[in-house]
Amino acid sequence: MTTPQEDGFLRLKIASKEKIARDIWSFELTDPQGAPLPPFEAGANLTVAVPNGSRRTYSLCNDSQERNRYVIAVKRDSNGRGGSISFIDDTSEGDAVEVSLPRNEFPLDKRAKSFILVAGGIGITPMLSMARQLRAEGLRSFRLYYLTRDPEGTAFFDELTSDEWRSDVKIHHDHGDPTKAFDFWSVFEKSKPAQHVYCCGPQALMDTVRDMTGHWPSGTVHFESFGATNTNARENTPFTVRLSRSGTSFEIPANRSILEVLRDANVRVPSSCESGTCGSCKTALCSGEADHRDMVLRDDEKGTQIMVCVSRAKSAELVLDL
């Protein structure tokens, strides 16, 4: 099996690179010698070191039973920080790329008996892996709702409109017209016993799903975002962070994140998106009350974990397990 380097990253090869929709490319990553890759489960993501020096996190979208490859889809984001553009424009088939081990902050709940999967745009990637896994298992039913602007911008369109998937997938195009948005009320009006909802997409879609599932049992509706939220909408105040292992304290000013301050002090914390959406910087919280601004943590994790790239403090001090 492929083994990580000293920095914990795998050195893989871009076995194939293909444009699969408007502004969206798929990348198939394999071991250069053909060795099996470390396993993953549906919902997992990995971090890629892209040519411009930044690191970006992408969800795996292939079948989790496959051990010979990782498949990701990358959307070219002209309004981003350049990571996706560099990955798409500055790589070719056959190039080497450094990739983290897969990690999963968005797993399918083993207690669920059926699933509603909701994807918006490039948010299809973890949902497709989930759908593949559920189809392979053949034990639990699912229905995938996939919302995009038009067919040309729909990743995996040909596959998901094939006879194989037709009975399990509903694709809806709004053509950029808000009045043609999909009406989810009939989907979420009533929940079935042990039915869970998984949603990945733009903030507006997640807000809609959250609003329509407010009456569902706690812990049955799960979200993963691929875009930053407006964390600046709240007023920032300074606070102190203390590291439990060294006892060192840092003042976090109103205009800087915990991650930025720790990075300047050469305190190693994994990171990628820096928008509270990927889960890379999740850090154990020993004491203090956090002001959670991420889109990753479940309610039952918020007392003991914090995403240091965006979240701040409600108390005067936070103690982190670093």
Swiss-Prot record:
Enzyme class at the top of the EC tree: oxidoreductase
Enzyme Commission number(s) of this protein: 1.-.-.-
Binding locations of [2Fe-2S] cluster: 273, 278, 281, 309
Binding site for FMN: 56-57, 73-75, 81-84, 125, 226, 275
2Fe-2S ferredoxin-type domain boundaries: 239-322
GO molecular function, one term: metal ion binding
Keyword Ribosomal protein: no
Gene3D superfamilies the record matches: 3.10.20.30, Nucleotide-binding domain of ferredoxin-NADP reductase (FNR) module (3.40.50.80), Translation factors (2.40.30.10)
Residue ranges constituting the FAD-binding FR-type domain according to the UniProt record: 7-109
InterPro entries in alphabetical order: 2Fe-2S_ferredoxin-like_sf, 2Fe-2S_ferredoxin-type, 2Fe2S_fd_BS, Beta-grasp_dom_sf, FAD-bd_FR_type, FNR_nucleotide-bd, MRET, OxRdtase_FAD/NAD-bd
The entry's keywords: 2Fe-2S, Electron transport, Flavoprotein, FMN, Iron, Iron-sulfur, Metal-binding, NAD, Oxidoreductase, Transport
Family: Belongs to the PDR/VanB family.
Job description of the protein: Component of the electron transfer chain involved in pyridine nucleotide-dependent dihydroxylation of phthalate. Utilizes FMN to mediate electron transfer from the two-electron donor, NADH, to the one-electron acceptor, (2Fe-2S).
Subunit and partners: Monomer.
Entry protein name: Phthalate dioxygenase reductase
Organism name: Burkholderia cepacia (Pseudomonas cepacia)
